Amino acid sequence: MRVFAGLILALAASAAGAAHEPWATIRFPQDEDKWWWDADWWERGRIATPANHAVRARTASYRNGEVEIPVEIFSAGKFPVVVFLHGRRGLDELTRLVPLRLAARGFTVVAPDLFSGRLIDKMPVRHDPVLEDDAALAIDFALALPEAGSQAKTCVVSHTRGGYYALKALVTKGRQAKTACYISYYPHWQHPEAPEAMQVYQYAPEVDELRVPVLVFLGEHEQYQRVRPILAGIDSLKAKKRDARVIVYPGVGRGFDFRPPEVRTLADDLAAQDSLARAARFIAGLIKQ
C-alpha cells in the first residue's frame, strides 16, 4: 500500500512539474491571439510553397527639385510594385539583398538610395527632413512605373531608420491614400534626434495616425529603446481598432534580415525567411495590379 501511495505522489509531482512555466520566455505578443495560426498545416500537414522567381535589377532615378535620387529596381516580370526604404546603413552589398529577396517572391521592388543623391555618408547620426520628401516621392515614382499597370496603391517595406522615413512619408507627406500597407523590420519609431527619454518611453506621434494595415518584425534581443516604442505603438493602434500586428522572433537581435554569413546564425535565417514569407503574403492580400 505504501509503495502504491508513493507512486501516486510521484506521478502527481511530475505532472505538477510539467505544468510549471519554463525558465525562459517563450510567449511573445503574437502568441496572445495567435493570428498566425495555420490550420491547414496543423491538421493536414500542408505547408505553403513560396514563389521563387529569377530577379533582374536595373537602375533608374527620380527628381526632387534639383536633386536626382538614384533607384535600383528589382523585378522578375510584370508583378505588383512595392517600395523598399533602407535605414542608416544605406543600400550596400548586404542591404540590397533585402529588396532582391522580396522581388523573388513575385514583386517589382523599387529601392531608392536616399543618401548618395544628397552626398550623405552611410550611418548618419542626424536626421535630414528632406529625406522624408524623397521617400514620399519614391511612392509616386513606383506607381508610375509600367509594371504598376492600373495598380492604385503600393506597400512600403522598410527596416531600421527606413521605418521612420516610411512613417513620415505616409503620414506627414500624405501618401497613405497611395499605400496599401506598412511593413517594417525593427523600425525606428521615434524622431532620430529626440531626447533620450522620448527614444525609450515614447513613440512618434505619427504612429497613431497610421490608417493602413501594419506589420512589424523584430528580434527578442532587439535594443530596448526600439522594442518599447514599437510594442507601445502597436498596442495603441490595436486599441484604435486598426489592423496592426507584430512578431517578435526568439533568439535573434537586430539585423537578422541582412547580417553577413560570418556572424549569421540559424536563428537569423529562420527569422529572415519566415518574415519574408509572411510579408509576401501580407502584401499579396492587400494590393491589386
Annotate each PLM feature.
Residues W189-R245:
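The feature captures the conserved acid-bearing segment of alpha/beta-hydrolase catalytic domains
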